[in-house]
Amino acid sequence: MERISRVRAVVLLVIFGLIISFFSMKLFSLQIIETDGNTDNTTTFTTLTRVKAARGDILDRNGNILVGNRASYDLVFNHYVITSSDNTNESLYKLIKKCQELGVAYNDHLPITATRPFEYTLDEYSTAWRGYFQKYLSERSIDSDITAPLLMENLRDRYDIPDEWTAEEARAVIGLRYEFDLRGVANLSNYVFIQDVSDENLSAIKELNTPGLMVESSTVREYHTKYAAHILGTMGAMDSDDWAKYQELGYAMDAVIGQSGFEAAFEEYLHGTDGTRVDVVDKNGTIISQYYANVRDEDGNIIGVDSPKAGNNVETTLDLNLQIAAEDALADVILWLQNPETNEEEAGRDVEGAAVVVMQVKTGEVLACASYPTYNPITYNEDYDQILEQDFNPLFNRAFHAAYPPGSSYKPCTLIAAMTTGKYEVGEIIKDEGVYRKYEDQGFAPKCLVYTNYRITHGDIDAQKALEVSCNYFFYELGDRISSQALDDTAKALGLGEPTGIELDETLGYRANEETKKLLYAGTINAGFYTGNRILASIGQDENRFTPMQMAVYTSTLANQGKRMKATFLSRVVSSDYSSLVYENEPKLVSTLEISDDVYKTYVEGMKQVISGTQGTARETMRGLDVAVAAKTGTAQTGMQGSDHGAFICFAPADDPEIAIVVYGEKAAHGSTLGQVAKAIIEVYFDGDDEIGEVAYVENAMG
């Protein structure tokens, strides 16, 4: 009997031991494998970390990297670890003080001012961030109408902030506590405390041993050239409109996107796909294991891992050598004009801004594009406040967004309209009488510029001579002969006032026609488009307003005998490792204006004489070049005090065009002087000559 009792006791002990072992193993499973960090006695935490994908490079047509990435470090919090530590507030307080001591900015998205009197700053945040804030209040059962000061009192109690801390100290720590809680409320990835921290500051901060603060490898956008600022573009955080668009594309709310230039235009190619990493850490923040999360199909089958995928590389049509030549030459000419010691004439000294565009005639590829004044994209963030204070708005991209009157550079368009409609025959002579008196009895009698300045005329001239000397009288007569519709149709077919197709945002400008007059002067006596308007439009005045980019398309179309190509900056897209072609851009023909060989020869020969003729308005500009150039100068009245605007268009070689160049200067006085910029570009393009000659101001050059 006693033996049986002992056996029963042993059996009971074994059963009890098995029960204890079972629950011990279950508890181990809960703590080690399945913990979510919600209990105080957990020993590990499993979190998901978004791993940012590297952005693709931007290159020029020769493979030079214009914008790339450099390796950097971010400081990221595992919020489970820091909030489970014994002295969360004190650790955060020390961390914040160290950052303030080092002058290091950190991320804090609590929409309340940092100092008293506390006020909301919701207007500074996107719709998504404002939504997260409201969700936070709801999850914490806090009235959404609560004032900022009352909310600060509420959160101070909620997070057990010591009474002896100042309101500002409390606000700083509460900002971080809010970030931690937001991760659980809104299911966000780990909180990035500091981005791109320097090695020195990283070492100083790591010495604090702040629980849960981890170092993550990352990348930062880096510009490799001080040139092309207006077209390379900038990066920035998303606003509410951006978020509405990119959320559907899988972007994280705090993703940085292209805001302007190439960065914005080619966002779809450059942006990579972020990955998701699983981190298992102990209560001290020590990493136990890390791996990328599995990707499953609709049936739950594992089909891969969610690792980051770098963005593709974009090869642009830009030629960095030509870009450098264009920007340097443009700056040289502007500074030359502004300097009384070099520019002895007063005209042009008040020059303000300028732009230049270089385009490949047969493809529409933009080889260079510059706007003056400019800025250094490498130091853009540091210099931003100073840039805003500079004269003439360096941030304004004049090549795309400034619409100017073309002046006499428009005259080839008028000639084409007259010849293609049979209103002017090859070789026909028109006598310049100085004053166009046909409508004098109606109060309209425009003058030729040489008559205005010197009381002389050009006499009997044909179309080629009229282009050479830029005779306004000749083109007044052509403008009177042709219909408004014929002139407008020709200008449109040549690309003036039309979208260029360029990937960057652009201003459309407008052509001088009946529709434009009604639009600009609705309800006034100036709303009509009369004969006088058409005659002035024929020399590039009246309401003609075009961007330098549109003028580049126009000039290329002239060179291409009426074939208008889509303007583009995109050459091709290749994979992140350069091993495969993703997309190759092909030249696109937009439209064709039928221009006969006789018409083409007439205006090309006339434009050649602008350079080579004895009276050419730019005869001194291209002196010394080995390549023949077809050009047209332009002087456009501004209707304001100061110098006239200046324009210069050309293509080369004249007999088999490869490139078209447009230079425009605000209050530059004469287009002929701007031809110096084109000359420098042509020298580099054809000769590879980086030496830019001295600026030569051409006196008495009109057009």
Predicted regions and their residues:
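Structured segments of extracytoplasmic/periplasmic soluble domains
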Residues: 98-105, 204, 208-212, 234-238, ...
